[in-house]
Amino acid sequence: MSFIVIIPARYESSRLLGKPLMDIQGKPMVEWTWMQAKKSGATRVVIATESDRVKAVCESFGAEVCLTSERHESGTERIAEVASLLGLNDDDILVNVQGDEPLLPPDLIHQVAEGLETHPNTLMATLCEPILDVETVFDPHAVKVIRDCNNYALNFTRAPMPWSRDTFGSEPKTLPGNWPYRRHIGLYAYRSGFVKRYVEWPVCALEQVEKLEQLRVLWHGEKILVLDALCEAGVGVDTEQDLIKVRKIMANLNPDGAL
């Protein structure tokens, strides 16, 4: 199977300025993510950034880098520009690995690409994992996904959804026993031709409110396949607290700085 990993790495992050270059065990965060992507079986790994500074750092550790516009609303928009700049074929499978996922298992990158390849009529695929505690359901940084009976997404939201009337209405809140809550893993596979279509659609109101790029796809009536992840996704870095947590994890796993 042939697929290309593209890693959006935005220096001007709204929550953590310079996030791709933040140090973890002597390497910038984006380098750890790139190293994981290189182990996934991808035929090519490209880092996409709007920053000359990020570009220079990434090229220094041997990565292929594509300099993109500063005006993109999302990683998928940045990937569409890369597909155009590199002249990728419409049938090429692209995997969007966010640059703030230094612990993302390579097996999950391969899984989402394979999921798209084995569903030829599907335009976009992603992954999810079980939510085991009620705190995560109420955490706005944990995106919840609801699927239909064929594992296609009905909705993605930061809100506690679905709302359990019986167990969320009083304290202490508990998870209901009759619903499998799922956390979305922000990893996408799509064909190059589809991302070119994606950027032609206007940003939708729901996407703007939730700040979730995948909602544009559902808004325009297309489907997203959501597969159960084969293993735990690891901790991504959205906040300063996440960064502290990841540094502790990697210091314990990698006292010599090697993942």
UniProtKB/Swiss-Prot annotation:
GO-annotated cellular components: cytosol
Compartment annotation: Cytoplasm
GO biological process: one example: lipopolysaccharide biosynthetic process
Keyword Ribonucleoprotein part of the UniProt annotation: no
Catalytic activity: 3-deoxy-alpha-D-manno-oct-2-ulosonate + CTP = CMP-3-deoxy-beta-D-manno-octulosonate + diphosphate
Sorted UniProt keywords: Cytoplasm, Lipopolysaccharide biosynthesis, Nucleotidyltransferase, Transferase
UniProt-listed InterPro entries: Cytidylyl_trans, KdsB, Nucleotide-diphossugar_trans
EC number(s) given by UniProt: 2.7.7.38
MF terms (GO), sorted A to Z: 3-deoxy-manno-octulosonate cytidylyltransferase activity
Family note: Belongs to the KdsB family.
Protein function: Activates KDO (a required 8-carbon sugar) for incorporation into bacterial lipopolysaccharide in Gram-negative bacteria.
NCBIfam families per record: kdsB, PRK05450.1-3, PRK05450.1-5, PRK13368.1
HAMAP family: KdsB
Name of the protein in question: 3-deoxy-manno-octulosonate cytidylyltransferase 1
Provenance organism: Hydrogenovibrio crunogenus (strain DSM 25203 / XCL-2)
